[in-house]
Every structure is written in C-alpha cells, then in structure tokens.
Amino acid sequence: MQFGELLAAVRKAQANVMLFLEEKEQAALSQANGIKAHLEYRSAEMEKSKQELETMAAISNTVQFLEEYCKFKNTEDITFPSVYIGLKDKLSGIRKVITESTVHLIQLLENYKKKLQEFSKEEEYDIRTQVSAIVQRKYWTSKPEPSTREQFLQYVHDITFDPDTAHKYLRLQEENRKVTNTTPWEHPYPDLPSRFLHWRQVLSQQSLYLHRYYFEVEIFGAGTYVGLTCKGIDQKGEERSSCISGNNFSWSLQWNGKEFTAWYSDMETPLKAGPFWRLGVYIDFPGGILSFYGVEYDSMTLVHKFACKFSEPVYAAFWLSKKENAIRIVDLGEEPEKPAPSLVGTAP
C-alpha cells in the first residue's frame, strides 16, 4: 500500500512539474509576443523616418532643407534594441533540478519508511524565464527625475486607443483619443482575440518599452481607471485578474468621485488627493517607476508613485466601469502655449 502511495505521489509530482513548465512556457511566450509587437511598431516608425529622410534629400532649397532637418532632428529617438530571450539557457537549470531530485529520491527509497513523509513535502524551485534587452550605452546612466511640467513635457509620447481591444460598449471618437462607456448600447466591432469581452477596458495602440514616457488624460465620471498592463492580460476572462486592478502585472489609479485609489494585485490604497480632472502619467521604464500627477495649468501635484518591475513592453490601459464614464487623451502637441515652469508638489 505504501508503494502504491509512493507511485501516486511520483505521478502527481510529474503532473505538477509538467503544469509548472507549461505555465512558464506561456509566460515566456507572452513576454516574447509583447516584445515582438513593440519591435514591429518600432520597425514601422523607422521606415517612416527613412521615407522622411528620402524626401528631405530631394529638397534643393537650402533654407527649406534646414527647416525640415531641424524638425526631423527634434523627433523622438527610435533606436532599435536587440533582444535576448534566455529560455534555452534556463532549461539546463530545470534539467539539473530534475536530475538532483531523482538521485535524492533513490536515496530516500533505501530507507523509505523513515523518509517517506519528508519526500511528500512539496518543494518549490525558483525557475524563471528571463527576457533581457541589450540597451545602448547612452541609456545606462540614469538622468535626474523631472521636477517641472516643462521637464515632463520633454518625454511626451503620443498615444491613442487601440480599436481592436475596445470592449463593445466603449465608443471611440476624436481619432481614437476619446473613449466613452455607452452601456447598454453596443458598437459593431468585429470579434477579435484582442478585444475585451467582459471588462469595459481598452489599451493603447502604442507599446512603452526601455525609455521614459509622459502623457496626459482627462477623466470624466466616478469609476474611471487609468494605468499600465502587459500584453498578456486575458481579454476574454471574467475573473478579477482580467481587469487592470486585479493582477500583479497591472498598475492603475481609480477616481471614485471623492478621492483617488491606487490598485495593484487586487489590493487598493486610498489616497488623499484630488479632485483633478487632468492626470499626467509618467513612466520611467529602466527605473521601474509609474507616477500619476494631478495637472493644473500652473502646477503639478504628485498623486501616487508605483515602484514597478517591468520585464516586457507595457501598454497604457483604461477601465471605464460605469455608464457614461469617459476618458480623453490630451494632444499635448496642439496645446496653445507651454505653461511656465513650476515645481511638482505632493498631495497632502
């Protein structure tokens, strides 16, 4: 009977190891797919820059050429990173764990009556699939954190809502810069794997990876969430882990009509800040920082700062939980004038 239990334990251990490996494989694929999407986006941006350079090369007027060159020089750096995915290297570690465990099991069987209970204990192995990026040397030295709105605006990144991810109750307007919850009115969006099925959420079309980014949004109505998530979020799930407040790879800020609340891994942190109808969102990918600021014309107030561990490209994420909620992405490139420099304050 004891040998029967031992055999069952071995089979259970085998099943658990296989399940563990499958989960890690899916996590690795999710990270790789996120990086692939980011590289494809960067490739398209580089092709666009190539076309702009070819157009400039054909300009014969020297003054016009210099004007176009200055505009091009001030555009965002779109360096193309190389990527190393270390899944193969990690397999040797898994093989070592299994080999050592087998030897240990044989030793236990020599005196199984005394060691059986010890063998039955579960052991956890810290086996990770790591995706690492090779970053250019000029990004190794960390720059000081911005302290004025003018400095934040140096990192402006233009984002739009991705119509292929928008829930059927969300209406996109203004060239995909405004989203509104129109429940119960549905919109005739095609059924796509990337579209959210249960939670009224939408992601940005652009990925954020390796650099610093800044954008601003205007929020309308209690129950709006603004944050970041990874490409691997389950768009079809109904569980809390499928919304941007309920998992450990999403970070979000909620406005409940009275105050802001920070959310991470289904845990909330009430904040004494607000009301602010415009939020500034700052991402320092290398530094692992996500900060939210209340923005007024002449001031910025820190609402909350997350310390994050980014391992793959992230996307701006938005959850409009109630009817008539709306979020608008501010086009900072069309603001009438830049505000005077003002130091960033902290909410009391």
From Swiss-Prot:
All residue ranges annotated as the B30.2/SPRY domain in the record: 139-337
Matching CDD domains: SPRY_PRY_TRIM16 (cd12890)
Location(s), subcellular: Cytoplasm
Record GO cellular component, one term: cytoplasm
InterPro entries named among the record's database cross-references: B30.2/SPRY, B30.2/SPRY_sf, Butyrophylin_SPRY, ConA-like_dom_sf, PRY, SCF_subunit_WD-repeat, SPRY_dom
Chief localisation class: cytoplasm
Coiled-coil ranges from the UniProt annotation: none
Protein name per UniProt: Tripartite motif-containing protein 16-like protein
Organism: Homo sapiens (Human)
Gene: TRIM16L
